[in-house]
Amino acid sequence: MKKLWIVILLLLPLFAQGADDVIPIPRVEYLEFARASADWTWDNRDSLLTLWRDNFDEKSIFGYRPPPRFLEMATIYATLYDYEGNIEYANRAKQVLLDYSEYKKMYPKKEEKRRPDYTNGVPALPDFFTNMRYIRPYEVLKRKGFLSDSEKKEIEKVIAHSIDYVLQSQEWGAMNRSCLRAEALAWAVRAVPDHPHTKYWKSYERALGFDNWGNWEIEDATIYHGVWLYALLGYADAKNESKELFHTPEMYYYAQYFLHLMCPDGMIPDFGDSHRIQPNWSRFLVFFEAAAKAYDDPELKWAAATIGRKFVDFSKVQSIGLAYLLLDCYRFGTDDLNPAQPTILSEEVMEDVQGKKIVFRDGWDSKSSYMMLNYRDEGDGGVIFRDYLRDAIPVEEEKMTHGHADEGGICRLMHDGTILLVDGGYRDYMPSGMYGAFRQDYFHNRLCVRQGKIWMGQEAGEWRYSPTDHPKIEGQSIIDYLHNAGSYRFVRTQKIDFLTFDDFDYCRTKLIDDKLGYQWDRVVTWVKDPGIYIVFDVMKATEEEWMTAANLWHTRKILDQGDHWYLTQYDSLTNKKYDPESNLLIYFPETHYRLESVEPEKRNYQNEIVISQYTGQHFELGEHIGFVTALIPQGLDEDPRPWIDRISFIDSDNPGDGMSVEIKLDKQTIQVGMKRDMRMDMVRDYRRPKYTYESGKYNCGKVETNADFFYTEKTKKKLSFTVVNVSKAYYDGKELFAQLPSQFGLAFDGSSSEYGIGKARYWRDEIDFK
């Protein structure tokens, strides 16, 4: 009869949902998976123990590693006993707890003596990622009166020794490893309240918990966001303060933040220390289930259902680690919410202080178009936390902490269910791989700048060097030129602008590198029909210096290429076969004094290719250069060549003032353009406004304006246009917009002149234009 009810409960959502809706996972399905996984582990415990012994690594950098799986099994059985009263489950959990300390005898005495942290003996629970999984089942069995006094004494001895060991090393701050320690301490305080060391545990627990509770996490990495959030849930659970946790504004923020980062791949894209194959989806699943219940939010329930349906295979009951997490989905979740797919499209996620992400999207299903740009810098928050880690552990390649030099980088581009651009991965060995793999700037889809000028060489027939027959002279590899140890260099970032409309979306971000002496603006425009991305990159020197700038794009495979264009594809991800349904055409329409290269690289745990467009020169103070890239998603059988004829670069009449791209389609011509230096207007400080139209205007083809950005779409009879931060705009001599004059008094020079023209935020219109 029990099995019949389970089947009925599993089928109920099928009747409640529409055909296009994601089906939520009933809580009982989580519970029964946990039960089945615990049973499988119990039935196979002898062979699992043999496997552990056969593969035991006494030289592990992490020291003693106890057998996996058993603590998760014990937690599941203890919880089931708590719910159902099955004595067999309690006995199984107890046996794990009583036997667990015996396994450390596998660790050789000679290795024990080598480690200064083992001066008080080898801990049975050396890993703060999992030691709460020993304490949780003990708390249940003790609370239920299932253990004898001698059994409690033996288990509490193991807990005390292991918790004291955790406190021999110190990691604190608003980050995952600190929060895991706080969680373990909270469970120890709850389960062993009368131990002589409990007062010390309480002190440490409060210190670590205080840093994380109601605070901004200092990490910027998908994997570790998941670890931190799940540890916070466990910490609150141990203290019976889950409701209070979700009342903090930071937790509500993070629930919305990660929801709005969700991509068509069914998960939050990987950024920072992460990679696509294991972005910690299981911990995010628990978090979204818990947050959906806490906030009664159908969209958060949609995120949980999407992740669960994408990743969980309920037939693979061997996954006891997953079962442990899914048990918490049962404990923290609810069946009283129907998922609702979010409706907001392109947006800032969530703002330009903490989140610092921009997402372009046209929907929320697996075939939607999606781009995510990350401009998160280290920022000003969490200074003491970041400095402590910098000073205590070898993390010189990280944007403190677990972040990458990916500021301004495009971490993910998807179209029609296919990944076209992806982040570079975590690392291939500790602390980082060669050249800081994969954290340094040259592993990301971004502009990279170095002081000094690269040796360019020359192609045959060029006149850069003196030999009279003008031979080919090999230049320097741009990647070799950029390479270094991978040590992270502090920079600052800003969002300059973000706008979204029916026909296009636009963003502008800035990176400021005070030490190298440059600023970099990245302007991304998504032209929704025909669905292409125009990327402008402007590097401005803030010092007089020789500099080299390289516009880098990474891929797995080049299918075809021609003059300044490359048809690319990802056919594997993290060295695992991937079946794409689309390709990406990368095209550089601006080519003057720009060199290009295609070089092999090790990235994302596989052999990849980096496509570079670069140049080098001496920069005067304030001088700038620009790069232009068109990113064009393509069908697998689509010929890229017609796009090359349709897309052209249109420079400003006075080179350096602006730049634009023209896209010729069958029924209309689109032009996208931008002002290179947004401060070029500023010519006077003695009165306001500081600018005039004449000081800020530039011409790109038929467009004249002082706008920071413009977008025009011309058909045979109509002209639609958008101009941003603008006083005036003209098209082919016809005035499109003119801001009316206003009064600007109180001039600093004491003059009586009050006439002035300000700038409109933006102006959009459509006019007849033949």
Question: Which residues does each PLM region occupy?
Answer:
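Aromatic-lined, polymer-binding surfaces characteristic
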Residues: 26-30, 35, 42, 49, ...
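Terminal, non-catalytic domain-edge segments
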Residues: 19-36, 44, 253-254, 272-369, ...
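A surface-exposed beta-strand-loop module
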Residues: 604-626
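Positively charged n-region of N-terminal signal peptides that target proteins for export
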Residues: 1-4
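Catalytic and substrate-binding regions of extracellular carbohydrate-active enzymes
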Residues: 316-563, 570, 621-636, 645-653
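Polysaccharide-binding surfaces and accessory modules of carbohydrate-active proteins
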Residues: 548-603
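Hydrophobic h-region of N-terminal signal peptides that target proteins for export
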Residues: 9-17
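Non-catalytic terminal regions with compositionally biased, polar/charged low complexity
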Residues: 623, 632-770
